[in-house]
Amino acid sequence: MDALTLLTTRKSNKKLTAPAPNAEQLERIFEAAMRAPDHGKLHPYHFIVMENESLNKLETLLKAAVVEFDLGEEKLMKAENLAHRAPMVIGVVAKIDPTIAKVPGWEQMLSAGCATYGLQLAAQAQGFDNVWISGKWVNGTALREAFGCREQDRVIALVMIGTGMEKAERECRVIDTKDFVTYL
């Protein structure tokens, strides 16, 4: 699949199973992610790979966030499901350095977001479906500690990666660009 087709047909797929990327494929995914736009060459992000037994640890961390934020019993069950939705989960932390005036925090956050998107595209290009998960639970104290976050850092994604149980339909809904583009 050429790059433009990949970009214009990418879709999330929440129904994932094994296999996940192997070590060589994962290395390529990270190489692609680290080519994200990055003013100041800061690489303001960190990736945490979870698979096998560490998915049980993720479940514990997500459940702790549900309790911490009093999100209720339904979210507690969702946390259990979420941690085991895919054979591999990659946590993404935006590592923000507020002391760099030349590259403000918002710009560092954008770079981390672009790296996450690059990670998704590289996985998709190698035949792996994925979905970017976020929400209040990524702000849980236990999860942030496990991911090595400093106060200024933000967990911006839990990217679930695996093989689609059902192939995500490549026909994406048509988006009229006129609603989003203005020419001066």
From Swiss-Prot:
* Entries under CDD domains matching the protein: YdjA-like
Q: Which InterPro entries match?
A: NAD(P)H_nitroreductase (IPR052530), Nitroreductase (IPR029479), Nitroreductase-like (IPR000415), YdjA-like (IPR026021)
Q: In the record's cofactor note, how is the cofactor described as bound?
A: Binds 1 FMN per subunit.
Positions binding FMN in this chain are 10-12, 35, 39, 132-134
Example of a GO MF term: oxidoreductase activity
The reply on keyword Flavoprotein is: yes
The cross-references to Gene3D superfamilies, in alphabetical order and at most eight, read: NADH Oxidase (3.40.109.10)
Give the record's keywords alphabetically. Flavoprotein, FMN, NAD, NADP, Oxidoreductase
Which Pfam families does the UniProt entry name for this protein?
Nitroreductase (PF00881)
Catalytic EC class: oxidoreductase
EC number(s) given by UniProt = 1.-.-.-
Instruction: Enumerate the residues binding NAD(+).
Output: 122-127
Does Cytoplasm show up as a keyword for this record?
no
Cofactor(s) it depends on? FMN
Domain of life where this protein originates: Bacteria
Complex formation: Homodimer.
Family assignment from sequence similarity:
Belongs to the nitroreductase family.
Please report the name of this protein according to its UniProt entry. Putative NAD(P)H nitroreductase HI_1542
Q: Which organism is it from?
A: Haemophilus influenzae (strain ATCC 51907 / DSM 11121 / KW20 / Rd)
